[in-house]
Regions:
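Acidic/glycine-enriched connector segments
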Residues: 1-172
Length: 172
């Protein structure tokens, strides 16, 4: 997980390359492929012979509306084409809502809930969470990197519970 706008892109790039080089044999990266950190990490994972699985926070056509620049959307589509598997997170309260309730970019609570559900999915199904961000958890946005970090902290606090799955290590 990470910020869409990486302030120190070169440092993030180096950290990612070091992470993948030190991780042993290739494995699987789960990623939302969002602009910024997600796409950077996915590219380096693919260069390092890892499989990448795209975990989209909503149906593809809706998610593509969140890419603000044509170049970012093209990069997303190119990475998506290289993914081993694509999973779309079901719409929150799908019984009560249809696709049109989230049809405008940044449509408040519903869209935020989809990003929050993506964060929950990643925390539940990953063993190591790589965070590229500024470290500020003072005002977490729903589904944002700071909130995902807080979810990771909660999962780590429960890691001795045999019923607990998910994140065992956080790197940032």
């Amino acid at each position: 997980s990470g910020h869409r706008r990486l302030g120190q892109r070169a440092m993030a790039n180096l950290k990612c390359k070091n992470f993948f080089a030190a991780s042993g044999p290739p494995s699987v990266l789960l990623s939302g492929l969002a602009e910024g950190a997600d796409q950077l990490v996915a590219e380096i994972a693919l260069e390092s012979s890892w499989r990448v699985e795209a975990i989209l926070p909503m149906p593809l056509a809706e998610y593509e509306k969140d890419f603000t620049y044509a170049a970012a959307l093209a990069r997303f589509r190119a990475l998506l084409a290289r993914c081993h598997r694509i999973i779309e997170i079901p719409l929150a309260s799908a019984v009560d809502r249809d696709i049109h309730t989230i049809s405008t970019p940044r449509d408040g609570v519903t869209r935020e809930q989809q990003y929050r559900n993506l964060g929950r999915y990643l925390v539940e199904y990953t063993q190591t969470m790589l965070l590229l961000w500024d470290g500020d958890v003072s005002a977490p946005k729903p589904g944002g990197t700071a909130e995902v970090k807080l979810m990771c902290d909660a999962a780590l606090a429960r890691q001795d519970d045999p019923e607990c799955h998910g994140v065992r290590r956080v790197i940032h």
